[in-house]
């Protein structure tokens, strides 16, 4: 079975288009309405500033609506020039500028100009680093604005909206040409004020922070704008198709179209317990799929033409092939399609398959595989794993059921192993069916499953209970993580001082009766551990506002007494973010509006891929409580009666991970003669160790030597091809002595027959000395979507800081809604709000049930579910026939082990939180040392026993010094099992022995040191098995 490979949310491993690549088919657009002119960019800047500082969401809508109406009245009905600047992240025509904060800083230093030792030059280059004097640190556009304002002589900007769009078009067209882009940016510098440049830089960085969501902009622009965008992912088409606010789309216009990118359906976040997922299926048999972590991809085919694009609408046809004579995939899959197909759209995941090792390679190799034009049979290649059929022979299948679509999918495609395959799927009926499949996935180092209701329809850009992710249940969390909204914060002290260090989080209160009021949020939990230094830099750059106890935020409901949920500062929901949190349990508390809080909470990640609409609701909190109480009642009633047997199983040893035996590898060339290498494996890749061995063999075969250890004074070249920085590699990087090179340098050198130049593109991390080398700087620029290097892995700091105390005074509830302007009469007209004209907004769907149809195409759904016999003569909804039938999972009833009482985390019942200064307090660790393994009847590897024993002695001291407890394998409160990477042969057995009542985290010993270095509890995923 093919295994999934890790994939970042924004597809950083995916390649970017270059000038040499062929132009893609130009989309057809309706004739745009003609404007009578444009407007000064300054009036749009005034709108940005009003939106960014306005507290009330309804007032922001009215401001936006007033501005749109004035444009239509004075300039015309073509709002595309404005929408491109309001929603730069949605502008496909300017997908890439090739300019990030670092490049912009260097460019501005030259064009101002500033000396490299000038304090402002240093400030621009080090904009992320917080200082006591520099309150705007972490917000690059604001830092730039302050630097420019000291030197710019422009009092009034002269750029118009059309001129700015032309300038931005020129910057995008000249991506990678720094000299040309610098000249274009000089036009901006010479013709706009410092404040205007601040907003232009926000547009270039595609990070506006104007407190207005994309859905709000679309809803104000036109009632059908969001529906149309979901079907085409094309801002220009939305602007020109819907220029008339009074014209409504018909149902056909909201369907997907061949060769038009659409916003795919997504999975709902996992439920707290697997039983809840089963319940959400409404008693139906359901479909179980393994969750694949490749790159989400849609494939369109019409006749002999193909079109590929990502979840975000990025066109990858140039990579995979527009026709059978082009690309790295199309020539090999054309024969897989049934000859009766005229046109078809498939949804699936793009992976990288290695025919030699018969497994998937790390996601970072997708670019190399996709660009490979050699067509050699044994080279790694893209493989498309299909899980849905959405369009067939002119008919949209969005309103058909999953079962129907899958049944017909198997009659449309004949799988070609390693090229195009179906996602493996099983039928389930009980929670035990899911757990059985989860056990298989976990043993294969997978990360989860997707459960689908067989009658689910396909909802564009939708996320409901018809598709649910399932992840394993762990001892130190409630069975799953939750996504909560950060609403407020408290300042830290001591080593955590200098800004916000504790975050107050809330859930959306969906218990309130339906009304036109803005959503309210109920305080729920405080988080003080789990985030890294880079995360805190990003968090502190947010536009925090001072908390006024006499006038607290209207959207936030807090406890009547107590101070736990009262912050020093707060964030408006539109400026906030979702935090992924795990905790031991939910417990009663009168310190939060919910009446409950989380015990031992800690942050796992900032979910910048989620919107505030993905926030956990109050109803979901109470559902979690109900299911937990039910579980306890069942335990007390003795439903789980069978105790686990203590029979010890002997397990087979896994291959050694010290490196391959190179004695039998013949040396064929002297390409790497005299060069020494240390190869690191990718901990996120299931084939990491195997990939490492193959690379070491390649090095040896070409004259190089390999070592296992990086010595301080060694001149060894470090090789690493992952996307994260494992702890042991971080230690090497921190020394500042060694470069870290990507494996592509090895393969390219072998191809060239000599060592390839050390260009920037080959570096995962470069030392400061290397960065000044001519060879290193030969590259024209970085590619969009490239896997981030170690130097770039700190979170990109978001902009939009509002200094405490800088906001305008809160408005009285009875204040008239008309906005008072101190500007001239013309500007006043742009922002004049008319209460009688409030844009209609689509209603929010509250019901996620499969019985409630929330499809955009509900108005055209047939009363009966026809099959596609008219097109294809295939089977319909029957369960039995042929290729459309699902493999049936075993449904035998499994018994669960008895648990002596309700085991709770913590040293006492009263303990509620982690201690940020004693990070392992309340956690219990089992060390998989050779002595412990032998005592429990498990085999060990004698070769490493002494070294591993000594290492575990040091790990034990670190754990104890930081508040943790060392326990035995059968300790009920056990939370972590620590292994040494030199001998992980007992991983599967330890996983089985510690999986009840919930799984324990299996981590490498490096995880302990990484936590101590960061001063917080890190997410175990990076160092787990």
Curated annotation (Swiss-Prot):
TM segment ranges: none
Active site: 291 (n6-amp-lysine intermediate)
Keyword field contains Magnesium: yes
Entry-linked PROSITE patterns: BRCT, DNA_LIGASE_A1, DNA_LIGASE_A2, DNA_LIGASE_A3
Cofactors (names): Mg(2+)
Catalysed reactions, as listed in the record: ATP + (deoxyribonucleotide)n-3'-hydroxyl + 5'-phospho-(deoxyribonucleotide)m = (deoxyribonucleotide)n+m + AMP + diphosphate
Superkingdom classification of source: Eukaryota
Gene Ontology annotations for the cellular component aspect, listed alphabetically: DNA ligase IV complex
Subcellular location(s) of the protein: Nucleus
Binding site for Mg(2+) 2: 447
Binding site for Mg(2+) 1: 349
Ranges of Acidic residues composition bias in the record: 775-785, 806-816, 845-870
Example GO biological process: nucleotide-excision repair, DNA gap filling
Any one GO molecular function term: DNA binding
Binding site for ATP: 289, 291-292, 296, 349, 387, 447, 452, 469, 471
Biased composition (Basic and acidic residues): 817-838, 891-904
Chain positions covered by the region annotation Disordered: 1-36, 773-904
Domain spans labelled BRCT: 667-763, 915-1025
Swiss-Prot/TrEMBL keywords: ATP-binding, DNA damage, DNA recombination, DNA repair, Ligase, Magnesium, Metal-binding, Nucleotide-binding, Nucleus, Repeat
Enzyme Commission number(s): 6.5.1.1
Task performed by this protein: DNA ligase involved in DNA non-homologous end joining (NHEJ); required for double-strand break (DSB) repair.
Family under the similarity heading: Belongs to the ATP-dependent DNA ligase family.
Protein name as catalogued: DNA ligase 4
Lineage of the species this protein comes from: Eukaryota, Fungi, Dikarya, Basidiomycota, Agaricomycotina
